[in-house]
Structures are given as structure tokens and as C-alpha cells.
Amino acid sequence: MLEINKDRIKGIVLALKANYYIVQIDTINLIPELFKKKIGDHNFRLLCTKRSRLSYKGHSVSVGDFVLIEAIDWTAETGVISFVEPRKNLITRPPVANVTDVIIVVSLLDPSFDLNQVSRFLMKAEETGLKVTIVLTKRDLIDEKILEKYDKKLQTWGYQPIPISIVNGEGIQKLSARLKSMKLGVLCGPSGVGKSSLINYLLPKISIPIGKLSKKLKRGRHTTRHVELFSIYSDSFIADTPGFNKPEFYTEPSQVPQLFPELRSQLLIKKCKFRNCMHLNEPDCAISRDWERYSNYKNFLQEMLNYHH
């Protein structure tokens, strides 16, 4: 992550608080020696403002942005953002830049597993075009047969779910390996499914920064009021997001088939007679109707047709 350019240091925006930006930099070899002995951590954070010219030019700063920092005061742990690098992408709810993965977190019980709700969250994740992982929390609350039922169902949808329990640690090793392979993964899901509990479980294993900034932030048990990145491993980050129970959609009807992996896989090997086939009642449609979420597909397609009418 480290980069120097005319006395500017590269970092990643972890959080926005009021008019300030918390930026993590990896500068163990750059921080003045006397100060380095006090902090003892290479993942160092600065509380930053941004140059007014960025606003004049219409350059917003979002969590996940890579930025250049100047006017650094190592003692006060402050700096000024002078440049925002071009983004690879930006998801909008909530705004997070340079996302590589979407992690849908749903509970197996309390709140109960809702297949229709899970399907809609997965569809929303597929809209991003990014890699999608589904995590099933509270594994310890259900028996093996029920888990197998949900696992097989999600596999037919095109996913490999990761069931976990923060009570007994089941599945955490597999999830950790998956998180380690990500650059920036966003946790999404309904309220109350255990996203924040999962973050709190992982936090002891994460390199938590020390110094004045951490004391100013008074971080204790994590609860989600805004989006924030957490550094895991070396160059991997996860973003927790406020929970919401009903994803909003504005999908173009022609793009709806791309939200269903089980339909996409058919389209890779089959071709319909008409290029604009919506896989409903068109003649010579090559797509099978014999898949579980076909009714979900039809209903959602009609929903989007009505929306765009």
C-alpha cells in the first residue's frame, strides 16, 4: 500500500466521521525513529481533512478510496488528503470504493432463515458484478439435517455457503481463509443476523492500531452506525455496513437474468432464438424452466418491468 510521491504518502480511507477521514498508512520505515518506538505498529492511522480544491473539482472521498496524504503531523497524528486515486468501482449503498467481494451474512435462526429475503440479498450482490460469498451465522442453533437442507438449496442456486458459529468457532477457519483472499470485502445482510458480532469475534485476531487516534475514537464493542473498514491480515479489508431488511432494486429488465447464477450458467452453453429473449413464453427459448428459483425470476422480472414502465 505504501507509496511516496513528492512528500505525499498513500493510504486507504477506513472511515468518515463528521468532516474528518480516518486513513490507514503502512509507513513503519518512514515514521521518525523516536515516534516509531512509541507506536510499534506498521498499520498506522491518521485523522485527516481534505484540500478544498477536491470539493471544487467535484472529487468526493469515500471509504475504500486510495488517497495521497500531505502536511503530516506525526505527533498529532493528522494529515491532509490532497489527491484521490481513480476508483475501480463504487457501490452506492453504502458508498464504498474499490470493492472486490460482497459477503452476504444471514442467520440460520433468530432471526429465522428467510429464503425469499436471502434470494433478494444475493440478487442485489450479483448486481455489482463482483464475487459473492454467503455466510450462514448461528450454526450452533440448528441441527445437521436442517443445515444440509439449506446448504444443498444454496448450492443449486450457484453458491458455496460457509456456515459459522462464534459460540464454538465452527467454520471460522474456512471463513478466515476466504477473507484472507479478498482485497476489500463488504459485509451486507439483514439487521440482527450477527454481522457486528462476527466483527467483534474477529477483532482480537486483527491488528488494532494504538496511539492517540485510537483513544480519540474510543473504540470498544463494535456496533454499526456507519460504514467502516477493518484491516485483516496484511492487505485485506472488510467493511461492515448498517443492516437493512429489504434491498432496493432499479435493475434494467434486460439485466435481470445476470442476477441468477443458475440462469447465467445455462446461457453460457445455450442460445435462444431471439437475442432479447426474456425466458418467459418466447418461442425457441433454450432455457430450462426446471430450476427452483424460476418463479422468483419471473416475479422479479415483472417487478422490474413494472418499475421501468
Curated annotation (Swiss-Prot):
Binding note for cofactor: Binds 1 zinc ion per subunit.
Chaperone found in the keyword field: no
Protein localization: Cytoplasm
Gene Ontology terms for molecular function: GTP binding; GTPase activity; metal ion binding; rRNA binding
Top EC class for this record: hydrolase
GO biological process, one term: ribosomal small subunit biogenesis
A cellular component annotation (GO) from this entry: cytoplasm
E.C. number(s) listed in UniProt: 3.6.1.-
Pfam families: RsgA_GTPase (PF03193)
Binding site for GTP: T137, K138, R139, D140, G189, P190, S191, G192, V193, G194, K195, S196, S197
Domain of life: Bacteria
Positions of Zn(2+) binding: C272, C277, H279, C285
Keywords assigned: Cytoplasm, GTP-binding, Hydrolase, Metal-binding, Nucleotide-binding, Ribosome biogenesis, RNA-binding, rRNA-binding, Zinc
Primary localization: cytoplasm
SUPFAM superfamilies with a match to the protein in the record: Nucleic acid-binding proteins (SSF50249), P-loop containing nucleoside triphosphate hydrolases (SSF52540)
Xref: InterPro entries: G_CP_dom, NA-bd_OB-fold, P-loop_NTPase, Ribosome_biogen_GTPase_RsgA, RsgA_GTPase_dom
Family: Belongs to the TRAFAC class YlqF/YawG GTPase family. RsgA subfamily.
Assembly behavior: Monomer. Associates with 30S ribosomal subunit, binds 16S rRNA.
Protein name per its UniProtKB record: Small ribosomal subunit biogenesis GTPase RsgA
Organism: Prochlorococcus marinus (strain SARG / CCMP1375 / SS120)
